[in-house]
Amino acid sequence: MALSAEKTSFTFADYLVWDEDEHIELIDGEAVRMAPPSTVHQLISGELSRQLANFLEGKKCRAIPAPFAVRLFEGADDTPADVQTVVEPDISVICDRSKLDEHGCKGAPDMVIEILSPSTRRHDRLVKLNLYQRAGVKEYWIVSPSDQTVEVLLLKDSWLVPHAFYEKDGIAKVNALEGCFIELCKVFGE
Protein backbone atom coordinates (compact mmCIF):
# COMPACT_ATOMS: atom_id res chain seq x y z
CA MET A 1 0.00 0.00 0.00
CA ALA A 2 1.33 3.44 -0.92
CA LEU A 3 1.59 6.42 1.38
CA SER A 4 -1.67 8.32 1.79
CA ALA A 5 -1.50 11.82 0.30
CA GLU A 6 -4.18 13.12 2.69
CA LYS A 7 -2.59 11.93 5.90
CA THR A 8 0.11 14.10 7.49
CA SER A 9 1.08 12.08 10.55
CA PHE A 10 1.96 8.39 10.48
CA THR A 11 2.68 5.58 12.94
CA PHE A 12 4.32 2.18 12.90
CA ALA A 13 0.87 0.70 12.13
CA ASP A 14 0.93 2.63 8.82
CA TYR A 15 4.56 1.66 8.19
CA LEU A 16 3.69 -2.04 8.48
CA VAL A 17 1.26 -1.89 5.53
CA TRP A 18 3.40 0.19 3.15
CA ASP A 19 5.05 -1.45 0.14
CA GLU A 20 8.24 -3.24 1.13
CA ASP A 21 9.99 -1.75 -1.91
CA GLU A 22 9.57 1.78 -0.54
CA HIS A 23 12.41 2.96 1.67
CA ILE A 24 10.64 5.17 4.22
CA GLU A 25 11.49 6.19 7.76
CA LEU A 26 9.20 7.81 10.31
CA ILE A 27 10.56 10.76 12.25
CA ASP A 28 8.14 11.90 14.95
CA GLY A 29 5.19 10.89 12.74
CA GLU A 30 6.56 12.40 9.51
CA ALA A 31 7.21 10.01 6.62
CA VAL A 32 10.66 10.60 5.12
CA ARG A 33 11.38 8.89 1.80
CA MET A 34 14.94 7.67 1.41
CA ALA A 35 16.76 7.36 -1.92
CA PRO A 36 17.80 3.86 -2.97
CA PRO A 37 21.40 3.10 -1.99
CA SER A 38 24.19 3.27 -4.55
CA THR A 39 26.40 0.34 -5.52
CA VAL A 40 29.32 1.77 -3.49
CA HIS A 41 27.02 2.17 -0.49
CA GLN A 42 25.92 -1.47 -0.75
CA LEU A 43 29.50 -2.74 -1.14
CA ILE A 44 30.57 -0.83 1.98
CA SER A 45 27.53 -2.04 3.92
CA GLY A 46 28.17 -5.62 2.83
CA GLU A 47 31.81 -5.57 3.91
CA LEU A 48 31.07 -3.93 7.27
CA SER A 49 28.29 -6.47 7.86
CA ARG A 50 30.59 -9.35 6.90
CA GLN A 51 33.38 -8.29 9.27
CA LEU A 52 30.93 -7.70 12.12
CA ALA A 53 29.12 -11.02 11.51
CA ASN A 54 32.43 -12.91 11.43
CA PHE A 55 33.43 -11.39 14.77
CA LEU A 56 30.01 -12.04 16.31
CA GLU A 57 29.76 -15.69 15.28
CA GLY A 58 28.87 -17.67 18.41
CA LYS A 59 28.31 -14.51 20.48
CA LYS A 60 25.05 -13.04 21.81
CA CYS A 61 25.13 -9.81 19.77
CA ARG A 62 23.83 -9.55 16.21
CA ALA A 63 24.71 -7.18 13.36
CA ILE A 64 21.69 -6.64 11.13
CA PRO A 65 21.84 -4.67 7.85
CA ALA A 66 19.02 -2.59 6.36
CA PRO A 67 16.23 -2.94 5.62
CA PHE A 68 15.56 -3.43 9.34
CA ALA A 69 13.02 -1.39 11.30
CA VAL A 70 14.24 0.14 14.56
CA ARG A 71 11.56 1.63 16.82
CA LEU A 72 13.85 3.78 18.94
CA PHE A 73 11.31 4.97 21.51
CA GLU A 74 8.84 2.07 21.75
CA GLY A 75 7.65 1.46 25.29
CA ALA A 76 6.65 -1.89 26.77
CA ASP A 77 2.92 -1.16 26.51
CA ASP A 78 3.00 0.63 23.15
CA THR A 79 1.03 -0.68 20.19
CA PRO A 80 2.09 -0.05 16.57
CA ALA A 81 -0.38 2.86 16.52
CA ASP A 82 1.56 4.53 19.38
CA VAL A 83 5.00 4.43 17.74
CA GLN A 84 5.85 7.50 15.64
CA THR A 85 9.59 7.05 15.03
CA VAL A 86 10.92 4.16 12.94
CA VAL A 87 14.38 4.35 11.39
CA GLU A 88 16.31 1.93 9.19
CA PRO A 89 20.01 2.28 10.03
CA ASP A 90 22.39 0.86 7.45
CA ILE A 91 23.63 -1.55 10.13
CA SER A 92 22.33 -2.11 13.66
CA VAL A 93 24.21 -4.04 16.34
CA ILE A 94 21.94 -5.42 19.06
CA CYS A 95 23.22 -7.32 22.08
CA ASP A 96 19.96 -7.57 24.06
CA ARG A 97 18.03 -10.17 22.09
CA SER A 98 14.81 -9.35 23.96
CA LYS A 99 14.71 -6.18 21.82
CA LEU A 100 14.31 -8.27 18.65
CA ASP A 101 10.88 -9.25 17.37
CA GLU A 102 9.29 -10.18 14.05
CA HIS A 103 9.17 -6.51 12.96
CA GLY A 104 12.72 -5.45 13.90
CA CYS A 105 14.14 -3.85 17.04
CA LYS A 106 12.23 -2.34 19.99
CA GLY A 107 14.42 0.34 21.53
CA ALA A 108 17.94 1.54 20.90
CA PRO A 109 20.54 -0.75 19.33
CA ASP A 110 23.93 -0.83 21.06
CA MET A 111 25.59 0.47 17.90
CA VAL A 112 24.37 2.04 14.68
CA ILE A 113 26.26 2.56 11.42
CA GLU A 114 25.06 5.03 8.79
CA ILE A 115 26.74 5.27 5.39
CA LEU A 116 26.47 8.78 3.98
CA SER A 117 25.16 9.58 0.53
CA PRO A 118 24.67 13.03 -1.00
CA SER A 119 20.93 12.84 -0.27
CA THR A 120 21.26 11.61 3.35
CA ARG A 121 24.36 13.47 4.58
CA ARG A 122 22.46 16.20 6.44
CA HIS A 123 19.77 13.78 7.68
CA ASP A 124 22.35 11.32 9.08
CA ARG A 125 24.56 14.00 10.66
CA LEU A 126 21.78 16.05 12.27
CA VAL A 127 18.37 14.40 12.48
CA LYS A 128 19.50 10.83 13.06
CA LEU A 129 22.36 11.87 15.35
CA ASN A 130 19.82 13.65 17.54
CA LEU A 131 17.44 10.66 17.49
CA TYR A 132 20.18 8.15 18.32
CA GLN A 133 21.43 10.39 21.12
CA ARG A 134 17.91 10.76 22.63
CA ALA A 135 17.33 7.01 22.38
CA GLY A 136 20.63 6.13 24.09
CA VAL A 137 22.54 4.45 21.24
CA LYS A 138 25.98 3.82 22.77
CA GLU A 139 28.05 4.03 19.57
CA TYR A 140 27.33 5.72 16.25
CA TRP A 141 29.52 5.37 13.18
CA ILE A 142 29.20 7.81 10.29
CA VAL A 143 30.87 6.33 7.21
CA SER A 144 31.75 8.62 4.31
CA PRO A 145 32.28 6.73 1.02
CA SER A 146 33.44 9.90 -0.78
CA ASP A 147 36.08 10.76 1.84
CA GLN A 148 36.76 7.10 2.73
CA THR A 149 36.54 7.88 6.45
CA VAL A 150 34.75 6.66 9.55
CA GLU A 151 33.76 9.02 12.35
CA VAL A 152 33.00 7.28 15.66
CA LEU A 153 30.78 8.93 18.26
CA LEU A 154 30.23 7.49 21.74
CA LEU A 155 27.47 8.23 24.23
CA LYS A 156 28.84 10.20 27.21
CA ASP A 157 26.49 11.78 29.76
CA SER A 158 23.53 11.47 27.34
CA TRP A 159 25.46 13.08 24.45
CA LEU A 160 26.97 11.40 21.39
CA VAL A 161 30.43 12.95 21.24
CA PRO A 162 33.28 12.49 18.75
CA HIS A 163 35.62 9.74 19.93
CA ALA A 164 37.74 8.66 16.96
CA PHE A 165 38.27 9.38 13.28
CA TYR A 166 39.65 6.77 10.89
CA GLU A 167 40.86 7.02 7.31
CA LYS A 168 40.70 4.38 4.57
CA ASP A 169 43.84 2.49 5.62
CA GLY A 170 43.02 2.45 9.34
CA ILE A 171 41.81 -0.26 11.67
CA ALA A 172 38.72 0.94 13.49
CA LYS A 173 37.94 -0.22 17.01
CA VAL A 174 34.32 -1.13 17.74
CA ASN A 175 33.89 0.10 21.29
CA ALA A 176 30.51 -1.61 21.79
CA LEU A 177 32.09 -5.02 21.04
CA GLU A 178 35.17 -5.78 23.09
CA GLY A 179 38.00 -7.06 20.90
CA CYS A 180 36.33 -6.17 17.60
CA PHE A 181 38.29 -4.24 14.98
CA ILE A 182 37.28 -3.40 11.40
CA GLU A 183 39.84 -3.34 8.57
CA LEU A 184 38.87 -0.24 6.63
CA CYS A 185 41.06 -1.01 3.61
CA LYS A 186 38.64 -3.89 2.94
CA VAL A 187 35.60 -1.71 3.62
CA PHE A 188 36.70 0.92 1.11
CA GLY A 189 37.73 -1.66 -1.48
CA GLU A 190 41.50 -1.71 -1.48
Residue ranges and their predicted role:
Residues 1-190:
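Gly/Pro/Ser/Thr-rich low-complexity, intrinsically disordered segments predominantly at protein N-termini
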